Amino acid sequence: MIIFTNFRSTLAVLSACLTAITFFVSCNSEQLDFGRTGRNLEIHASRPQVVSKAFYTQDGITRIITPSASNRKLAVVNTTIVNRSSTVIPISVDPDAATLGDRKGKKSNAIDPFARSKEISGAIEPDPDVLEITPVLWGEIELSRGFQVSGSLVFDVPKGLRLGTIFWDEVEYIPVDFIDYWRDND
């Protein structure tokens, strides 16, 4: 009887530990929830985070990015680009490479985080309206087969824009939807 009780309590503790570990791993890991595959590339993206400021640190210097006007916000999308088939794919991540918006035609281009940022003295702490975007995904990249590159893309979007899709249009056109446009809204 004592052996059976100890076995049940050990099993209960083990089950509780496994449940807790599963919960913490799933809650604490950043998930790139959405992805689409094209002919040569895979694009994976997280749901856009809308903030009023974004910053990154490069060579010990902190730089901050702000929206271009008071009626705009920054949308940050963590993006991963994967080369599955071609030997080497040259990719140019620039304003024309990615747009964010909805399938009804309202879109905003990615902004150059290096040109739009301003150097600040001192440190800045992330909070719900200020986001750290290290590493930044921008510039010329040669992506070999079987490799991937990840980073943050920044968009200067009007307030109220429906951020339903990121449209990747470098090498090939790949839209990645964050919302279900075809769901019956009855």
Model feature map: region roles:
Residues 1-2, 20:
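Generic short N-terminal amphipathic or hydrophobic helices
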Residues 2-14:
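Bacterial N-terminal signal peptides that target proteins for export
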Residues 15-19:
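Hydrophobic membrane-insertion alpha-helices, especially the h-region
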